Amino acid sequence: MDPLNQQYPNSRCCSCQGYCPFSCLLYYCLVCDFALDVICSRKPISLKIYNPKRHKHTLHYFPRKSTLACDVCGLVDDDYSHLLYTCLLCDFFIHKRCIDLPYVIKVSRHNHRLAFTPSNPFKESADCGVCYRKIDINFGEYSCVKGCVYAMHSRCALQSDVSDGKELEGEPEEAYKNTKMFEDKGDGVILHESHLCHLMKLENQFHDENKHCQACMLPFYGDGNVYRCMQSCDFILHESCAYLPRVKQFMLHVHPLILELGYTTSCFRCRKCERYSCGFAYVCPIEGCDWKLDTLCASICEPFNHYSHPHPLFITCGEYTSIPCYICRYRQEQPLDCVECGFVLCFSCATLPHKLRYKHDEHLLVFSYKEYADDDELYWCEICEKDIFPHEEGLYACNECEVTLHVDCLLGRDPYMKSGQTVVTFGKEKIHYLPNTHLTRPICKTCGRHCPYKIKIKTSSGDLFCSYACYQEHLYNL
């Protein structure tokens, strides 16, 4: 083997599976495309491995190119980049990396732990809980330890967004205190942890579009019950938001998320929809992990049924894989998608309200989109007076009055921030969210447009911005 420091087709070490940077030395065989990094080249390759928990017989190194599938992960080593071991007594082949895979793991997409199960040709094939493809019964899988009909491919179960790969065999279950966020006082009265100063009472079909739920930050359109403060303050929660669990396992994060109550002098950016919010957040408690979700994104689970599509939606693509949304065309990592027809929906569109009111229309406007639109079919936004392209973006429309509006024009660029909120930024500057109700709309200092949205931002120095994104861009350009 020749020591090389240039880029070759296989820059991954065949022993440890680590990728060698361009500047690193590696030993590379020009004949069989076999590579070793410097560290692994100094370690002798184990010709025999005995791991009775994985296989009852001794495994022997198989020093040949082969297209045989690994009996644990089911993958065929097309590029011959994995060391392969075999049992001389059984028809059993296994990658070196699969010999020490954990036997019991905790995953983000199921409530119970999963245990490794070897191939069983007499077992009925199930769909993988990650990629939703059939699991080949001739290879190993991870299945529920509590007997649920739930399983994953070995390779899918050990993705970094599904499991941390820690061996949990013999380890006690983690106990998270998932008590209610409120104390029930009876007769529809509660004391919620987010509002300990006053009691809150249940009201039916509350309607006031100028008031917002303190958890999800959506206005009240009279489509459900609310808990309202019994004193003079305007603290109100949707009934469903008051019942939010203290701890939540989100399907794309390996750590349980803890409910963090409202942001009174700050805001956060949701990891999935990327909108800013001053409402409740689900936050990862692990130090150094910056996962934060607003309550709307955190409520999404599989299968997800959305009014814009007839089939259930799942998250089937791996981490760092981005696909454009069929509605807004924005490329998002791990969006929701349809396994039947390929429809893709980003979290931003998935969490938009189905119906909204517009002050100049007596009817409810419905969120919609057109996958295919005629070139001669024109749509015009009544607020910004610009064209709408329904095959490139969603819109809110009244079918009776033929009113159409851009999503941002109706909701604003910061729909989960409320008028009257004061935010202290990381630079210790105070910015104020104010109602944008004057006849003369102010000009945004960043984009130079008249601010068309319901609320505007004013800094302590008097500068005006139409959104938090414009304010951040201004800071970046300083």
Predicted ranges, named:
Residues 1-478:
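Cys/His-rich zinc-coordinating "finger" modules and their low-complexity flanking regions
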